[in-house]
From Swiss-Prot:
The keyword Iron applies. This is GTP 3',8-cyclase. Its cofactor is [4Fe-4S] cluster. One of its GO terms (biological process) is Mo-molybdopterin cofactor biosynthetic process. [4Fe-4S] cluster 1 binds at residues 24, 28, 31. Binds 2 [4Fe-4S] clusters. Binds 1 [4Fe-4S] cluster coordinated with 3 cysteines and an exchangeable S-adenosyl-L-methionine and 1 [4Fe-4S] cluster coordinated with 3 cysteines and the GTP-derived substrate. Its EC number is 4.1.99.22. Belongs to the radical SAM superfamily. MoaA family. Monomer and homodimer. InterPro entries: Aldolase_TIM, Elp3/MiaA/NifB-like_rSAM, MoaA, MoaA_NifB_PqqE_Fe-S-bd_CS, MoaA_twitch, MoCo_biosynth_MoaA/MoaC, rSAM. Catalyzes the cyclization of GTP to (8S)-3',8-cyclo-7,8-dihydroguanosine 5'-triphosphate. S-adenosyl-L-methionine binds at residues 30, 72, 123, 194. SMART domains: Elp3.
Amino acid sequence: MASQLTDVFARKFYYLRLSITDVCNFRCTYCLPDGYKPSGVTNKGFLTVDEIRRVTRAFASLGTEKVRLTGGEPSLRRDFTDIIAAVRENDAIRQIAVTTNGYRLERDVANWRDAGLTGINVSVDSLDARQFHAITGQDKFNQVMAGIDAAFEAGFEKVKVNTVLMRDVNHHQLDTFLNWIQHRPIQLRFIELMETGEGSELFRKHHISGQVLRDELLRRGWIHQLRQRSDGPAQVFCHPDYAGEIGLIMPYEKDFCATCNRLRVSSIGKLHLCLFGEGGVNLRDLLEGDTQQQALEARISAALREKKQTHFLHQNNTGITQNLSYIGG
């Protein structure tokens, strides 16, 4: 099914990133270094299972093929398995993924798969337990590693691992990461550090271009693969001697936004056209019952007329995004 969600730059949107909470129990230096602080979410709190069912139904009707559940830490919601099942009700949605810190992976991943989850991204910024603790504020490295093993045991053929690339922290550890994925079907995705409203100082200190790793991978014989239409923004590389893959997400690269295929809905029901963008379009008043789906679809489609051509990060724009937990990075 071709996506009906098309913007004025002829980009088609097949991929929804749906935040279901902004609460997180980790204190990652690049996201929530001081820990989670409630952002004043009052009124109805975070989206309910029924509201999630309605908003994903609308996106599915408009051609969305992939939904990623984000946060915060999605698995902190007690009804997380029910949320997966609610999204799974949409036959048009072929992929349901989660981005998680891995805290509850070992315990719950089999149940998530049974509910309909098809993909997992786990955040691991270092393979050194002490450095992992320093970055995340949690001494959970072994627990997260056990969770990744549990995901394979539960039947996931591949696990994606997200690593925020930081100068003088982990950028020099490529060989360690490559050894880890040589015999494991892990897609290791290095993500360039992005500047947010609260993270300007960290950005200036630790940002390094992913181009450095890209050049090194090509020098070592890694091969760039083609993207599918519902894939995320990573440039993916493979090598015949490795079971795993490497992905590079480089938002500061020229033309990064030209292939944008994803929209975001926050945990309080606002449609965000860009991670670094405007205040969002409220959808929640149309999620109260099943009778408003046509109006909901119309509002989503109309909002796309306002999507900008680029995120303007090159002009030092950080938008309203104070930290990445707010609308699910």
